[in-house]
């Protein structure tokens, strides 16, 4: 007997869109939050300000968990402009791994499955339905008919096979998400024009979630991909509600509505993703009407945004902001432990994020399956840190970081690095910081030439496997700690095959404790997803994965 899957993992990512002011000038707007958090206030006071603003606006009309029906009289010739803090690395979902690329990608591409509007419940997309064999190894997908890629190529079973084979049997080293999405795929077989069979090497509980991910999983046009030499970074071609127009590097990506889209047509005629690297400049662009939506918001500019009468959208962050030790250079776990002991993480998080991030006591956010409050991290102990580091002869450390804001660290990597540098200086360790823009930083990571680096992760699918898998990756751009442990890898493989429930959750907690005991990472914080938009923007949802699906978002 075969069983039909109704849904799998539900990630309870609670959404709270905060209405801090509505439409109007700063003189007409309630600025209580700004007054509460005055210049020079303590970290505790700043945290209270954030909590006060949240409490005052908890019943905001902008709080959405699903997209509302779009009015018939809405202007469908409008342009929606979204500003983010870095340029995309590329627009081929198989060849990139960053959020700045993902945001335009999700407007243009789709996968076999998709997530709910504000959660990680799996829903049909390019596959209308699927069956799973009793042994959990064979997935039979029944595809949506009549769908075409933007270049007119038919979407069918052959197209699915092309995409999966591209990242399995024909995988190249720059396909960073291939193992995350298709690592357990043994074969992909065409049954008929609109039926495809995917065979796994072992049961995989997160497999359907993986197929809904914004990177790796989306279907690209085989025709366009072949014509572009297997690289669609600058010539994207999917099935989604928006099509590619142009990419002005370091300035903007421009998309237009796909008038032939199989589903509900996009509202805006055009969507523009602007790159504005400076946090303050991005806020100014919002408040003076140059852009409609911004993300990557530093807690220090929240008051400026609310005072201008803009809306602040806040969702619980499915992410982790961390310091990674290069275990191939810092091979002594006692040295790694001592360096972690020198950093006062609670104080650091409070001072940098002003209540818009929480201390990470775990790699996994507390609302995710697999999280356990029993997992213990290295605690602040500067006296022991200084003694151990002196005994080990550690006087210098080289740190690699990034200069721009990230969704998991809106304070910027450089600001965080300088704060950690200050803690290490107090225990007699001089830290040299090399900071680069995001693209250059990723290139530097690839060399492995660092003792420690700052990094982070945004959960792609609501499953703990997606976080812990980083520490088993052979790709240094994913596994920046260069942690390679056969026992851990086996634990990870076993856990992925377990059904959701207590046993599986305990398995991930055991993995977390193992890497915590070995001080592979120093978990720092879980950043709340912060976006802001002008008062006439409607139907905006900041998804827990950090993406923003904008086809039904509009200005009234």
Question: What residues fall within each predicted segment?
Answer:
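Surface-exposed binding/hinge segments that line
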Residues: 177-224
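Ligand-site clamp/hinge motif
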Residues: 258-303
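Gly/Pro-rich hinge or "lid" segments in bacterial periplasmic/extracellular proteins
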Residues: 116-117, 204, 212-266, 270
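Detector for C-terminal structural segments
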Residues: 248, 342-370, 412-419, 442-556
